[in-house]
Amino acid sequence: MPMRSKTPTPLRFSNGKHQRDDSEYSWTDVGTGEKARNVSVLGAIRRAAKKVFVIIFLGQRKLKPTECRSDPGESSTHDRESTLSGWTGYSSPSSFGRSTERKVSGQYRFSGSRFQSPGKDSSSSKSWHQGPVIFSFGELQRATANFSSVHQIGEGGFGTVFKGKLDDGTIVAIKRARKNNYGKSWLLEFKNEIYTLSKIEHMNLVKLYGFLEHGDEKVIVVEYVANGNLREHLDGLRGNRLEMAERLEIAIDVAHALTYLHTYTDSPIIHRDIKASNILITNKLRAKVADFGFARLVSEDLGATHISTQVKGSAGYVDPDYLRTFQLTDKSDVYSFGVLLVEILTGRRPIELKRPRKDRLTVKWALRRLKDDEAVLIMDPFLKRNRAAIEVAEKMLRLASECVTPTRATRPAMKGIAEKLWAIRREMKETMICSSASNSSCSSTTHSFIGRDSDRYALPRIEDNENSIE
């Protein structure tokens, strides 16, 4: 019987469904090992030829006069190309795997690639571009009323974040860097975030719309997520506290995102800064992972298993094995995710210095309770203590304990973690249905959980009746 073989690939998502780009990747029925190798070699040759063509074609093509901007004070397409190609480590526009942006009659385009302008008719669940737009400063000034404080929605290590409205009506988040931040390390993080975001596309990852690097202005334009971050929800700053079913759904969304980064991209991507404040929440209480300034791509060299690098991350979330060896792997993200699971269950921050000394490290405190069969005592005081919620708390805490083991080799992969979370979800649903059958008035948690079932984003190869990701 013929076997199925495939080339691992990033998946493109539209309306919650994953699609494959048939122009570059395809499923192939293979009858023998020799045929599989031939198909693999042929695919590699085609991709290499395509890359060479793009580099030569885009590198030599000249702009027509009508394709240049006429707006005063705005950079030309040639300037934009120079900015992009002038970056250290990114020698040409094709370094992004994308093409250089041009603007003609108000419509954004890319040479040699498909592009859909993010107009008012475009669905928020669809990716509206195939690469980053290089904005002009004038465009971003108009979008934010000259960076008015009225439009300011946040501030962080990068700088100030504004809510903006592009010329075509698209609402975006505009991250403007602090000018006194500029240094070699910071500039690397700025460029790294753009480079990483330009290579990924997933419903549970914040989308990159574009950027600006002109003079002393450094700006990143990303998808606007309207409902704050997970930490704000756990602190009760965003209205009603999250119920257990909603917390589980958010954990699954983050697991989806990390599984994609580790498994389905061309080269595995390690986020390196998974924490509650980097998990943005939509109005439908779905999660999107943000902030890729620290992200790293694992080498494409055969056999590469880690990156030797300076330690980066947030206190309380950093993998102790990474701290000890300076070797970064995807299991470092797994450790951070385990800390995040504990944070979701308890509502506490990873480190709380105002608590008694033995309870200051939230993970250690929670795992002591688990060892004493007292998992219910770690639950956020605002969570309802029904049967389903208590069972989920214990199962998620056991899963978190696997993620935060000191030795990375014993930690599960994100793919397996996602499978276990789906199993917990199915069991919770069954418990709720059984409870509601004997009690005509279901809890609000039951309603919120079942009601979200039809609205969830799908992870590739995971369905309610499946036990694994293939």
Swiss-Prot record:
Cofactor(s) this protein requires: Mg(2+)
Post-translational modification summary for this protein: Autophosphorylated.
Chain positions covered by the region annotation Disordered: 1-29, 65-128
Swiss-Prot/TrEMBL induction comment: By cold, salt, abscisic acid (ABA) and hydrogen peroxide.
Annotated binding of ATP, by residue: 153-161, 175
CDD domains listed in its UniProt record: STKc_IRAK (cd14066)
Polar residues bias (residue ranges): 83-98, 108-121
InterPro entries for this protein: Kinase-like_dom_sf, Prot_kinase_dom, Protein_kinase_ATP_BS, Ser/Thr_kinase_AS
Keyword terms of this UniProt record: ATP-binding, Cytoplasm, Kinase, Nucleotide-binding, Phosphoprotein, Serine/threonine-protein kinase, Transferase
Catalytic residues of the enzyme: 273
Molecular function terms, GO-annotated: ATP binding; calcium/calmodulin-dependent protein kinase activity; calmodulin binding; protein serine kinase activity; protein serine/threonine kinase activity
Catalysis performed (reactions): L-seryl-[protein] + ATP = O-phospho-L-seryl-[protein] + ADP + H(+); L-threonyl-[protein] + ATP = O-phospho-L-threonyl-[protein] + ADP + H(+)
Cross-referenced Pfam families: Pkinase
Domain of life: Eukaryota
Modified residues (Phosphotyrosine): 322
Keyword Ribosomal protein: no
CaM-binding as annotated region, ranges: 162-185
Enzyme class: transferase
Family per record: Belongs to the protein kinase superfamily. Ser/Thr protein kinase family.
Subunit structure comment from the entry: Interacts with calmodulin (CaM) in a Ca(2+)-dependent manner.
Protein name according to UniProt: Calmodulin-binding receptor-like cytoplasmic kinase 1
